[in-house]
């Protein structure tokens, strides 16, 4: 059983000094910089971007509401 390099196996959270374990805006245990594309545009022509403070890839605020 291998342990993820970002994960403290006892606490089941990021190791000390690391930001994250996984997610679209996490790479090498750190949050991706704000403005990094995390989801490329499809039909609407607007990319989604990382915030620099979360592993989530928030929906571009200029896109319409999801159906």
Curated annotation (Swiss-Prot):
Subunit structure: Heterodimer with EC3A; disulfide-linked.
One GO molecular-function entry: toxin activity
Gene3D superfamilies reported for this sequence: Disintegrin domain
Miscellaneous: Negative results: does not inhibit alpha-V/beta-3 (ITGAV/ITGB3) integrin.
Tissues in which the protein is found: Expressed by the venom gland.
Task of the protein: Inhibits adhesion of cells expressing alpha-4/beta-1 (ITGA4/ITGB1) and alpha-4/beta-7 (ITGA4/ITGB7) integrins to the natural ligands vascular cell adhesion molecule 1 (VCAM-1) and mucosal addressin cell adhesion molecule 1 (MADCAM-1). It is also a weaker inhibitor of alpha-5/beta-1 (ITGA5/ITGB1) and alpha-2b/beta-3 (ITGA2B/ITGB3) integrins. The inhibitory activity of EC3 towards alpha-4 integrins is associated with the MLD sequence of EC3B subunit. The ability of EC3 to inhibit ITGA5/ITGB1 resides in both subunits A and B.
Keywords per UniProt: Cell adhesion, Cell adhesion impairing toxin, Disulfide bond, Secreted, Toxin
Family named by the database record: Belongs to the venom metalloproteinase (M12B) family. P-II subfamily. P-IIe sub-subfamily.
One biological process term in Gene Ontology: cell adhesion
A GO cellular-component term linked to this record: extracellular region
Protein name as annotated: Disintegrin EC3B
InterPro entries the record matches: Disintegrin_CS, Disintegrin_dom, Disintegrin_dom_sf
Superkingdom in the source lineage: Eukaryota
Motif (Cell attachment site): 42-44
Domain named Disintegrin: residues: 1-65
Compartment(s) where it occurs, according to its Swiss-Prot or TrEMBL record: Secreted
Keyword Secreted: yes
Disulfide bonds: 6-29, 20-26, 25-50, 38-57
UniProt keyword annotation of Disulfide bond present: yes
A Pfam family of this chain: Disintegrin
